Amino acid sequence: MKFLASVAVVAALVAPAAAQPAEHPAYGLELDGFDYPHPVQRYEFVSQGQRMAMAYMDVAPKSPNGRTVVLLHGKNFCAATFERQIRVLSDAGFRVVAVDQIGFCKSTKPQGYQFSFHQLAQNTNDLLKSIKVDKAVVLGHSTGGMLAARYALMFPKATERLVMVNPLGLEDWKAEGVPYATVDKLYESELKTTFETVKAYQLKFYYDGQWKPDYDRWVEMNAGMYQGAGREKVAWIGALTHEMIYTQPVVYEFPKISVPTTLMIGQTDHTAPGANRAPKETAAKLGDYAALGKKAATAIPGATLVEFPGRGHAPHVEAPEEFDAALLKALSASGSPTAP
């Protein structure tokens, strides 16, 4: 009996430890501590009266084909998420420039900044000019897709081709009935960000309930900044950029896009920022990317639609081989509208 009692005590002591949630890394304000796959450079400039720097990777191919691809990340992603695409594109002869936008990842986090897609597009164009990129394929994923569309509208002569990968902004959420949330309310929500909340959100909306251990790294990258010493600043930027996404639709200007365009759409994606604030019947209709992709392809003159059945919000992460093959095929296409 003594022996059994001892076993019970040991089991009781061990059980709580086993039940503890896994520890996840905390990163600095500029994603300090998270390694990128290539050397990170910084474009320093003044914007809205503030000195700041955009982090970026500029990867040269071994056998150049004379073309450049610019990669624009989403709100919950970074330039590093394109790790595989950088390699694939570089191997195919493309110069690849993967940018962390101001307010994100390894770039400056200005607290008193008027965030707009126009401003971010201007920053990006200035960066590209500084490294002598006059024209490029501009590929944007998620929020980066909205930015890429704005970039193509602002700088058509600098855009060889627009590629949007499950972009946000294929619908106007406020017009569809999603209530406005103040920056202060959004900040309160952003402060609650953890590995678990990010994973739960992505599992539901990005990956259609199918999780792979490989995704953990990207969740840790995003959530880790919310656990570090700069968490309040990171959360504030998150609130400002969420409001930017909600209040600055680009969908109404799709017919004005004049550059060759490819839409790459995972069909099971249901992403709709702010849907949790909307009435259930409204939320249920939002984020139908299978339908939204087709609608966008019709609205954009000469656009090509590439669909990924059974894939969600991040097909380049979820099905990289399938995605990369389709991307290289799209970049070899010709015969689309030409910018004036």
Segment roles from a protein language model:
Residues 48, 52, 57-106, 326:
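Conserved HGGG/HGGXW glycine-rich cap/lid loop of the alpha/beta-hydrolase fold
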Residues 290-340:
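Catalytic active-site module of serine/aspartate enzymes centered on a nucleophile-bearing elbow/loop
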Residues 28-59:
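N-terminal cap/lid segment of alpha/beta-hydrolase-fold proteins
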Residues 193-255:
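Conserved alpha/beta-hydrolase catalytic His-Asp/Glu region
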Residues 43, 227-298:
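Conserved serine/cysteine hydrolase catalytic core
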Residues 149, 153, 162-193:
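Flexible "cap/lid" loop of the alpha/beta hydrolase fold
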Residues 41, 80, 101-117, 173:
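Glycine-rich "HGGG/HGxG" loop immediately N-terminal to the catalytic nucleophile
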Residues 118-136:
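Conserved acidic catalytic loop of the alpha/beta-hydrolase fold
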